[in-house]
Each structure stands twice: as structure tokens, then as C-alpha cells.
């Protein structure tokens, strides 16, 4: 019974605020359409946060944190928006965005793993750096080439966003459950010195964790730009961290 408590509380909260908003329904079909639209919009808006939260969960397992995720996603989106729209966007901007996201994530990992910079200091610095690069790329402009890219808007719709999030969770969840990687990450987070003595490649694992955050940041950039159709240098300034 306790596992149903939170969903029931959330459902009651939605019903309460729907009533307070003055929304009225003439029939049950009207209410069904309203809630279908409400949850579809909720999932689409939450897709970037869900993807980033998965990566942040892994980071927290290493006893680290990543404050740069919002700036990382914004920089990837800004660079992608600089490419001309059209079919070629899929094999120019998208692969470059993926490579950039992995590079930015690996940069965080290198600062932490190789230079022994504390995660909160390292990612605070890269948060400022990546945000500054957003302004270098964009200036004061707001670009919106994404609507002209064939099929790109589907990533911001309920079918595309939910499918992308679901596939990502299934693939990564299966990999984590079927490999030693997750156990090594947990041991690393508990005691990195003991993890080294146990033969765990601590430096490599930290690099992999922050590169994974970069990969998920790239997917978040896809869903964010597909949903909002435009990006500016100040996008996602409220996403300093996702916990």
C-alpha cells in the first residue's frame, strides 16, 4: 500500500489544482482529453531533466557532483543551432553535437580524475566556461533552425521524447545490471583508495562517468531544442545541477 501513496498524493494534487484553476469539463471525454494533453506536455517538458537526472545519479554514486550540466546542454544546443537547417543537419550538426558533448563531459572527468580537482570546484569552473562559450557562439542572438529540420520536431513530441527516454533508460539500465561497472562505481564512491587497491581503474571510471553525463546531455539538448524550437546563450541557466 505504501508504494501507491506517492502516486495517489500526486494524483490528488493534480485534481486539486485543476479544480482551483477553474477548469471545467462538460463530459468524461473532455476530462480525459485534458489530462492526456496535460501529461503529454509534462513528459515532453521533463524529458531533458529525466535524461540529465540519470547521469547525475551515476555521478552522485561516485561521491561527486556536476554543476555544469545546464551549461553543457546549452553549449551543445548553441553549436548545433549554428548549422543550416535541412536534411544535412542530421549528419553535420548532430554528430558534431555528440562529439562536443562527449568532449565537454570528458573535460570534467579529466579535471577531477587526472588533476585531482574537487568535483564541485571543477564543474563550477566549467559551468562558467561553457556558459561563456555560449555567448561567444551566439552573442545576443536567438536561433531557431530546428523547425526546418525534417522529422526533428518529433523528438519534442510525446511519442519521440518518451521513446527516447525509455530506450535510454532500458539500454543503460540493462548494461548497469549486467556488468561490473555499477559495482565498481559504488565502491569508488565509498572509498576511492580501497577501490584502487582492489584493482578498479578509478581514473578511467571517473572519466567514463562524466563522459556518460556528456552523452546524456547531448540527448537532453536534442529533446530541449526539438521542444522549444529555439535556443539562446541564456538557455537553461536554471539547470546548474539536476539532483
What are these regions (language model features)?
Residues 1-51, 87-92, 200, 208:
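Membrane-interfacial amphipathic/re-entrant helices at transmembrane-helix boundaries
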Residues 3-8, 42, 50, 71-72, ...:
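Hydrophobic alpha-helical transmembrane segments
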Residues 6-18, 56, 127, 131-132, ...:
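Hydrophobic core segments of alpha-helical transmembrane domains in multi-pass membrane transport
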Residues 13-18, 34-86, 110-116, 243:
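Single transmembrane alpha-helix segments in multi-pass membrane proteins
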Residues 19-20, 62, 83-87, 103, ...:
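Helix-loop junctions at the membrane-solvent interface of multi-pass transporters
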Residues 45-56, 71-75, 103-106, 166-167, ...:
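Hydrophobic alpha-helical segments embedded in the membrane of multi-pass proteins
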Residues 89, 93-95, 103-108, 158-231:
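Helix-loop-helix "hairpin" substructures at the membrane interface of multi-pass membrane proteins
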Residues 115, 119-179, 205-208, 224-236:
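Transmembrane helix-bundle core of multi-pass membrane transporters
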